[in-house]
């Protein structure tokens, strides 16, 4: 599983899986800026002392919800928090609040429409974290989810920061800071430097345009169109196995029912594997 995460590090940017990449150097004229636009404010400091990352590009919540459970079954919020799907979006905010909020934070949540009758002062964080604990492993390696940690470097040394809401302080509380701390996001992990790995706005990390997993999924799609369902499943499973996901055809949730079903599964696989 860790091999998936390590693909997007400088030491593996030219490994055998990378077929065609935009090659970058540690120089402002020969670089890419995903480290900044996909990042957060707890990346290493810029000349003014602020974290150099900006979360210009964030993860769509519907995309985050699309990640399967680890066993290949579909994720359903009601399995984690009964009644969640029937609640209004504003009311659901209560489940994303940090433990032991202050009176001011409570008043702000009420004003925003949160159903505070559902708030658990000592276990709110632990409850929402369960929604992300048993998912396709690529989710945790691609997305910073609520109350997950991120190894940042804004204070000059590597330090773990936690995605909490409402944000208070990255120095005193170790909260992960974003551009607009009044909002809570799903943030990117892929192509974002951890600790002090990528200390500049510009990044030397190569950007892959085509890698072997992409080839396998194209191959699977072609085989599926030729009605070779076993062949298509085999190619997709090569991708899923490396990531640590449940292989297709190995339990009740991963049985492929036909060509149309396989087409959708390949599309989903492309999303989860190639995000970023």
Predicted feature descriptions by range:
Residues 1-52, 73-276:
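Acidic/polar-rich alpha-helix caps and helix-coil junctions
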Residues 66:
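Structured-RNA-binding interfaces characteristic of tRNA pseudouridine synthases
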């Amino acid at each position: 599983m860790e091999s998936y995460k390590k693909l997007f590090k400088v030491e593996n940017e030219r490994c055998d899986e990378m077929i065609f990449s935009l090659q970058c150097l540690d120089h402002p004229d020969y670089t890419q800026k995903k480290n900044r636009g996909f990042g957060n404010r707890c990346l290493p400091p810029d000349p003014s002392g602020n974290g150099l990352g900006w979360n210009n590009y964030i993860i769509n919540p519907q995309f985050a919800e699309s990640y399967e459970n680890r066993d290949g079954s579909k994720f359903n919020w009601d399995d984690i928090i009964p009644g969640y799907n029937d609640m209004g979006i504003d009311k659901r905010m209560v489940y994303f609040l940090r433990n032991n909020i202050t009176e001011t934070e409570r008043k702000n949540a009420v004003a925003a429409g949160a159903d505070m009758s559902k708030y658990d002062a000592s276990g709110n964080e632990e409850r929402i974290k369960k929604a992300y604990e048993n998912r396709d492993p690529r989710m945790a390696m691609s997305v910073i989810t609520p109350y997950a940690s991120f190894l940042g470097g804004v204070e000059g040394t590597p330090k773990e920061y936690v995605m909490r809401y409402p944000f208070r302080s990255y120095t005193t509380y170790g909260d992960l800071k974003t551009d607009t701390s009044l909002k809570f996001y799903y943030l990117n992990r892929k192509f974002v430097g951890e600790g002090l790995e990528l200390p500049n706005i510009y990044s030397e990390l190569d950007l892959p345009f085509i890698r072997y997993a992409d080839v396998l999924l194209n191959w699977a799609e072609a085989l599926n169109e030729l009605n070779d369902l076993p062949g298509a499943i085999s190619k997709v499973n090569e991708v899923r196995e490396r990531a640590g996901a449940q292989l297709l055809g190995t339990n009740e949730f991963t049985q492929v029912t036909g060509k149309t079903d396989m087409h959708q599964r390949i599309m989903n696989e492309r999303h989860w594997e190639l995000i970023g």
